[in-house]
Structures are given as structure tokens and as C-alpha cells.
């Protein structure tokens, strides 16, 4: 590729990263500084307080986003992919089984926190933009909630159609948004350049020394400036490290700093502007265009969050932490563009209830932060584990780095934990529900498979017996889904027991999820002939991939085992779960597992096998 083409490609990817990765953090100027002076903390709009908050915001953007995430955390990738579950997987590779269990729990807590915060993010972003109506026309105040719901309803409805065509507009719109942030801020800074003194960290330090405990509580508002910081790491696989870093340092960070300091300059000049300093930065003639642009930007930010939920859910499903569910690919070109109906509509219902219940973005701000800062603490611990165990960094440097990260993260988390009764219970409750679901599905599924393995018949002995004294053979190929490599599938046993026949060719198909986002086609399928009529096929997929039976058959044909979909019968085992006597808490967990199993996507639907080729055989299993 020529140098010119490389530059064009880098520019395109960097622009795309601006449109997707930075949507959430890019819309935080709508509400962050306003919330710092909300009645929760009791600060008057005085120069020293304005300087203190601006200094805190600036250095938080530098230390947490620029240093922690962009410089350190993004080094931890699995074949280019990032995210809290990826970090969890990396951290557990070279540790003891006990330590791995602890790290897995931490990773699942972090993932659960994400589900909790994701309900708040679209609501607070869109409501903050729509609240600009108050400035343009105060009489429209009663319509803020209905308008916010209408905008988000449209966003969730179009998810099933994919965002491929509309998504092309995301990057240009967000670029215009960031340039607008910069211009509005610069215009105000030029009028009051003394606000730039807040770049000096002494203002942040003096803010803490003067206001002591109250300033500590105010960290709960300052954290709003870094909403969506996890997206930088989670979306690394889509865009790559360098474009994400380039977009931050050349466009996003300068625009955010200029806008925050522009709002601060406005407050120094006119303290009354605290009612909505972002929209009051704009001249009167630009208010309506800014309102429209802000709404578009918050919709794009919400879209990025929704896409993030879909990606995290698919990863959790493929890693066995959530039950199988319908995943629809909305693009033939981009494997990352997916739609999960049950997640989409559950999230929509939760967001609408949050908007109706909290009514104002200021009320929602009181609920935000506790989960995201908890995830930040977990990320620091997991990253330092990877640095120590996987990369073998100097032990003393890793300990120093961990302490340095926690010195920032723990106070942030502690300050936000104080929001528990003012709204912080919401993301924690939602996160707790997801944590219970994920741990229940993983542990109960493991116990179920272990029980089936213990009571199963040996594969080798069974095949030898069948070849020695074969039952009646019928023409064609039979495929049996096999979870365990050395145990006869239940469906095969029941077919022999009730039908007393066997196909001329029997394929035992095992699907394996590797600890990687993708598996190369060369390593996709391995075939082993177990006897003249039995074959074992193991198909390997990464956790970002969706298994496809037609593709497996194609690879089998290339490896010398031709299979035709419409000439093959697929035998599936369907377990009817019976709950045995347990302690009450395990009994409840068992009930939840049974409910999840009943609503899980059947294997035939999961792998898109034609219904007329599927035969399901039921079996009762005690758990």
C-alpha cells in the first residue's frame, strides 16, 4: 500500500473512531460542570470553586483517559480486542486456580456494572440535550420527558435494520460536534482568558485543602466528565490502538478542554449562567441549531452504548456466561454489527422507566458514577495482574503503578458510593441482577455437564460395541451435537434405545469456543475418523464469531468428509431439568437456571439448521 493510501486509510479509521468511540465522553460537557454546582454539594459559583472544578476535570482527563487507559490499559489486548471480559481472560491465564476464580469474579462484576450504567447513559445524554428547549422556549419544559422518550424510541426501533447506512453519518456529525465544542469554548475563553489559570494543578489541590470533605463528595459530579471511558478500551478491536489515540489527542481532548474552560469563563463573567452553561455559551441565533446538533450527538452516543451492550452480550454468550439468544447480523460486511432483540427491548423498557422515574438529567446524574468507578478499580487490578503475570514487568514497578492507579480510582469510587441512596442503587441493582444471572448460568451449566458426563457411556467402548454388533443401518448421515469429547451424546443413546437404528455415517459434532476473538479458517475444523462409520468433528470459533453449520460442512468437504445439508439429519438432545433437594438459596438459583434454560435459544435455531432436518430427543436430568 502506498504512503498516500495509508494516510487516507488512517484518516478514515480515525474519523470513524471519533464517531463511535468518543460519543459518550464527547457529550459529557452538556451536563458535567452544571452538576458540579448542583444543590447536592452546596457550592456557590465563585472563582476559586470554578478554577478548582476545571482543574479537577482537566487533570482527570489527562490522568485517567490519557495516561491510564490510552497509555497503559490499551496495551492489554487479545488479538487486538479489548474490554473488561477480555482483560479478565488475559489476567487468568498464568495464575493459580484460586486466583483465577477471584479474577473471574472481578471481571464479571465489572461486566455487570457496565449493564447497570448502560441504562442511565442514553437517558441522561438525550435528556440533557432536549433540556436545551428550556433555554430556547421555557414553555416547552413539560415536553422534555415525552420528547426524550420519542427520540430514544426511534433509536431502539431502527436497531433491527442495522446502522450501516446511517452509521456513515456518525463520524462527520461527531466531528462537527467536537469542532462546535471547541469554537464555543474558544469564543468564551478569548473573552475571559484568565480561566486558563485552572490548568495549574495547584487549583485542584487547594480545592481539596480548602473545602475538605465537601470537595471529596464533589468527585461524584466530576466523574461525569469521563463517562464512556471504558468504550476506548472495549472498541479497540474495531479501530485499533493508534487511531483511537490519534483521535483523542488531536480532536477530542482539545475540544473537551476548550469547551469546559469556555463554560468556566462564562461562569466567571455571569454566575447566573450555571442553570445551563453549555447552551448559554452559544449566541441566541445558534441556539436551535446547537440543540439539534446536541440531540444528534447524544443519539450517536447512545447508539455506541447500545452497540457496546450487544457486543458484550455476544461475548458473554460465547464464553458461557449467558444463555444462548438470537443474534442477528445486520451487515454482511461487518461481523461486529449485530442486533439482539431481547437485549434491545429489555434495555429500551429500562431506559424509558428511568426517564419517567427520574424526570430530569440532574436527578439521573445522582445515579451515575458508582458502577463506572467500580469498573475502573477492577480494570486497574486486572491490568496490573496481566502486566505482572503475563508480561513479567518489574514487580516493584507494577506495585507502584497499581498504587498510583488506585490512589485515583478508590477515592473516585468512594465518593460515588455516597450516591447509593440518591440514585446509585439503580445501576448497582441492575448490575447485581446481571451478576446473579451470569454466575448462575455458568456454574449450573458446568454442574449439569459434569453430571451428564459422570452418567454417560464411554465413547470408545460404545463405538467398538456398535461396530462389532451393528444395529439396523439406514442410508444417510446423522449429526449428533456432542458437548463432551469422550462421552456418547444422549441423543444417540435415545435414538438407539427407541428407534434401534443407526445411519450409515455418524458424525459427532463438538463446537468449541477458543480464548480468542477469531479463529483462522485453517484451524476452524479438525476431523478424526473413530471407526469405519463414526467421525468426530471439532469446530473452533472465537468469541466474536457465530458458529455456522453450513460453513462447518464446507470445511468438512475440503478435509475429505463431504456432507450435504439436505441429506443430513441433526439429532439434538433437549434436557428437561428436575430440581433435587437443595438449601433454599441453591434452590432459588436452580429455579432461575431452569427458567433461563427454558427461554434459551435452541441449538437448531442458534446454528441456523433447517427445521425439517432436526430431530429433538428429550431426556430428564436431575440438577
Curated annotation (Swiss-Prot):
Gene: kup
Catalytic activity: K(+)(in) + H(+)(in) = K(+)(out) + H(+)(out)
Membrane topology label: Multi-pass membrane protein
First-listed, main subcellular location of the protein, grouped into a coarse class: membrane
Function: Responsible for the low-affinity transport of potassium into the cell. Likely operates as a K(+):H(+) symporter.
Name the record gives this protein: Low affinity potassium transport system protein Kup
Localization per record: Cell inner membrane
Signal peptide: none
Membrane-spanning intervals of the chain: 10-30, 47-67, 102-122, 138-158, 166-186, 214-234, 248-268, 277-297, 338-358, 364-384, 396-416, 420-440
Cellular-component GO terms for this entry: plasma membrane
Organism, scientific name: Yersinia enterocolitica serotype O:8 / biotype 1B (strain NCTC 13174 / 8081)
Protein's UniProt keywords contain rRNA-binding: no
One MF annotation (Gene Ontology) recorded for this entry: potassium ion transmembrane transporter activity
Family to which the UniProt record says this protein belongs: Belongs to the HAK/KUP transporter (TC 2.A.72) family.
Keywords: Cell inner membrane, Cell membrane, Ion transport, Membrane, Potassium, Potassium transport, Symport, Transmembrane, Transmembrane helix, Transport
Amino acid at each position: 500500500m502506498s504512503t498516500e493510501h495509508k494516510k487516507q486509510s488512517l484518516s478514515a479509521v480515525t474519523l470513524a473512531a471519533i464517531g463511535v468511540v468518543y460519543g459518550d465522553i464527547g457529550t459529557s460537557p452538556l451536563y458535567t460542570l452544571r452538576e458540579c454546582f448542583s444543590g447536592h454539594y452546596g457550592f456557590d459559583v465563585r472563582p476559586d470553586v470554578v478554577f478548582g472544578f476545571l482543574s479537577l476535570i482537566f487533570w482527570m482527563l489527562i490522568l485517567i483517559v490519557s495516561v491510564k487507559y490510552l497509555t497503559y490499559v490499551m496495551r492489554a489486548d487479545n488479538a487486538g480486542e479489548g474490554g473488561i471480559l477480555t482483560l479478565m481472560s488475559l489476567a487468568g491465564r498464568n495464575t493459580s486456580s484460586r486466583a483465577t476464580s477471584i479474577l473471574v469474579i472481578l471481571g464479571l462484576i465489572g461486566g455487570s456494572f457496565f449493564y447497570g450504567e448502560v441504562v442511565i447513559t442514553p437517558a441522561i445524554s438525550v435528556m440533557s440535550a432536549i433540556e436545551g428547549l428550556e433555554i430556547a422556549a421555557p414553555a416547552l419544559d413539560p415536553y422534555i420527558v415525552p420528547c426524550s422518550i420519542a427520540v430514544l424510541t426511534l433509536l431502539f426501533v431502527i436497531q433491527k435494520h442495522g446502522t450501516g447506512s446511517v452509521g456513515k453519518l456518525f463520524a462527520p456529525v461527531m466531528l462537527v460536534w467536537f469542532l462546535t465544542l471547541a469554537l464555543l469554548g474558544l469564543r468564551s475563553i478569548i473573552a475571559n482568558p484568565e480561566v486558563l489559570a485552572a490548568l495549574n494543578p495547584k487549583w485542584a489541590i487547594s480545592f481539596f485543602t480548602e473545602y475538605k470533605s465537601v470537595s471529596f463528595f464533589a468527585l461524584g459530579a466530576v466523574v461525569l466528565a469521563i463517562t464512556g471511558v471504558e468504550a476506548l478500551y472495549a472498541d479497540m478491536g474495531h479501530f485499533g490502538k493508534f487511531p483511537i489515540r490519534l483521535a483523542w489527542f488531536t480532536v477530542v481532548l482539545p475540544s473537551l478542554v476548550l469547551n469546559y474552560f469556555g463554560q468556566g469563563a462564562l461562569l466567571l463573567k455571569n454566575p447566573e449562567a450555571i442553570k445551563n452553561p453549555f447552551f448559554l455559551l452559544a449566541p441566541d441565533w445558534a441556539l436551535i441549531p446547537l440543540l439539534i446538533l446536541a440531540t444528534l450527538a447524544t443519539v450517536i452516543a447512545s447508539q455506541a452504548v447500545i452497540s457496546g451492550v450487544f457486543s458484550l452480550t455476544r461475548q458473554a454468550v460465547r464464553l458461557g456466561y449467558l444463555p444462548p439468544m438470537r443474534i442477528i447480523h445486520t451487515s454482511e460486511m461487518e461481523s461486529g454489527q449485530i442486533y439482539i432483540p431481547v437485549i434491545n427491548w429489555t434495555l429500551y423498557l429500562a431506559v424509558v422507566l428511568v426517564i419517567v422515574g427520574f424526570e430530569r438529567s440532574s436527578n439521573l446524574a445522582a445515579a451515575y458514577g458508582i458502577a463506572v468507578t467500580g469498573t475502573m478499580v477492577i480494570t486497574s487490578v486486572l491490568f496490573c495482574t496481566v502486566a505482572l503475570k503475563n508480561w513479567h514487568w518489574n514487580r516493584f514497578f507494577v506495585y507502584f503503578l497499581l498504587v498510583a492507579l488506585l490512589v485515583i480510582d478508590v477515592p473516585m469510587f468512594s465518593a460515588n458510593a455516597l450516591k447509593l441512596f440518591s440514585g446509585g442503587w439503580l445501576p448497582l441493582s441492575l448490575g447485581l441482577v446481571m451478576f446473579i444471572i451470569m454466575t448462575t448460568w455458568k456454574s449450573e451449566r458446568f454442574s449439569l455437564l459434569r453430571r451428564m458426563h459422570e452418567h454417560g457411556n464411554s465413547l470408545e467402548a460404545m463405538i467398538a460395541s456398535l461396530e462389532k454388533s451393528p444395529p439396523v443401518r439406514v442410508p444417510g448421515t446423522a449429526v449428533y451435537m456432542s458437548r463432551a469429547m469422550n462421552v456418547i451424546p444422549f441423543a444417540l443413546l435415545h435414538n438407539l434405545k427407541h428407534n434401534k437404528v443407526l445411519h450409515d455415517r455418524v458424525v459427532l459434532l463438538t463446537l468449541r469456543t477458543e480464548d480468542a476473538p477469531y479463529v483462522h479458517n485453517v484451524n476452524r475444523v479438525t476431523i478424526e475418523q473413530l471407526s469405519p462409520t463414526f467421525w468426530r468433528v471439532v469446530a473452533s470459533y472465537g468469541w466474536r464469531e457465530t458458529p455456522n453449520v453450513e460453513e462447518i460442512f464446507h470445511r468438512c468437504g475440503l478435509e475429505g468428509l463431504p456432507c450435504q445439508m439436505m441429506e443430513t439429519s441433526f439429532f439434538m438432545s433437549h434436557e428437561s431439568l428436575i430440581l433435587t433437594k437443595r438449601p433454599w438459596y441453591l434452590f432459588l438459583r436452580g429455579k432461575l437456571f431452569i427458567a433461563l434454560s427454558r427461554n434459551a435459544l435452541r441449538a437448531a435455531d442458534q446454528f441456523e439448521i433447517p427445521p425439517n432436518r432436526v430431530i429433538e430427543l428429550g431426556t430428564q436430568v436431575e440438577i
